[in-house]
Amino acid sequence: MNEQELKQMIEGILTEMSGGKTTDTVAAVPTKSVVETVVTEGSIPDITEVDIKKQLLVPEPADREGYLKMKQMTPARLGLWRAGPRYKTETILRFRADHAVAQDSVFSYVSEDLVKEMNFIPVNTKCQDKDEYLTRPDLGREFDDEMVEVIRANTTKNAKLQIVVGDGLSSAAIEANIKDILPSIKQGLKMYNLDFDNIIFVKHCRVPSMDKIGEITGADVVCLLVGERPGLVTAESMSAYIAYKPTVGMPEARRTVISNIHSGGTPPVEAGAYIAELIHNMLEKKCSGIDLK
C-alpha cells in the first residue's frame, strides 16, 4: 500500500464515522484583546520619603501608642506586617530602594565641583578605580611619589593640625555633611586659638591613609573626615578619625573615633564642636586613642 492509497483509506474511515459528511477543520487563532493605555500626568511617590519611625503597618495593634513610641527609639524596621508568610509589597520595595541608595553611595564619587568649591587639595591613593578600591584596601592607604609631592607642596610643614577629607565608602556622606562640619570645627578651634588651612581631599581613601599624610606633613594632629560604609538606615553617615602624630603601621588603638555623624545621628554641627575639643585635648596631652583620658 502506497502513500496515496493510505490517505484514501483514512478519508473513507473518517467519512463513515461522520455519517458521510466531511468538514473542513480550521485552526483556531487566539484573538488578542486590545487594552487601552491611559497616560496620566503626575509622578510616582518616592517611597524613601516615608519616615519608617512613624509608619506602623500592623493592623489593629494591641497598643498602638506603645508601638509607635518604641519605633521612635530605633530606626529598625519594626511593625512591618505580612501577607501570608511574606512581607508586604510596600516593605519589600522600601528595602530594595534603601539597598539601592547604599549601593549608589559606594560606587559614586564626590562631586568635583564640591571639591573645587571647598578649595580642597585633591589627591588620589594608588587605587585606579572603585573595583580596585573595594578589592585592594591596602592600596587605599598608600600614595605614589607624585601624590606625595603634591601633599608636601601644598601643606604647611609641622603644623599643629592637618584636616583631611576622604570619600571612603560613602560619597553621599561627604556631600551631605562636609559643608556643615568644617565651619563648626573651625569655630570651635577659635576658642583655643587654633586654626587650620589647606585641607586635603583623598579619593579612594582608606582610614590608614591619614597615617601616611601625618608622616609627610609632620602635623601634630591629623583629623580625617571620611564616609562610612552605608547601610539600610542611611547612606550619609560620616566618621572622624583623629590621631596624635600618626605613623604608618601604628596600632588602631591610637585613633580616636567619632562615628554616626549625620542628620539622624550626631548632627554635623554638634560633632564639629566635639572634634575641636578633642583636638585641643590631644595637643595638650600629646596623645590620642585609648591613651587620651
Swiss-Prot record:
Renumbered to this chain, the signal peptide range is none
What start-end ranges are recorded for coiled-coil regions in this protein? none
The note on cofactor binding and number reads:
Binds between the large and small subunits.
What pathway is it annotated to?
Amine and polyamine degradation; ethanolamine degradation
Its recorded reaction(s) are: ethanolamine = acetaldehyde + NH4(+)
Which EC number(s) does the record attach to this protein?
4.3.1.7
Q: Where does the protein end up?
A: Bacterial microcompartment
- Zinc in keyword set: no
The UniProt entry's GO CC annotations, sorted and at most eight, read:
ethanolamine ammonia-lyase complex; ethanolamine degradation polyhedral organelle
Q: Which InterPro entries does the annotation name?
A: EutC, EutC_C, EutC_N
State any GO BP term from the record: amino acid metabolic process
Which residues does the record give as adenosylcob(III)alamin binding sites?
A: V207, E228
Q: What is its main location?
A: other
Q: Which family does it belong to?
A: Belongs to the EutC family.
Against NCBIfam families, the record matches this protein to: PRK05465.1
Q: How does it assemble?
A: The basic unit is a heterodimer which dimerizes to form tetramers. The heterotetramers trimerize; 6 large subunits form a core ring with 6 small subunits projecting outwards.
Protein name (record): Ethanolamine ammonia-lyase small subunit
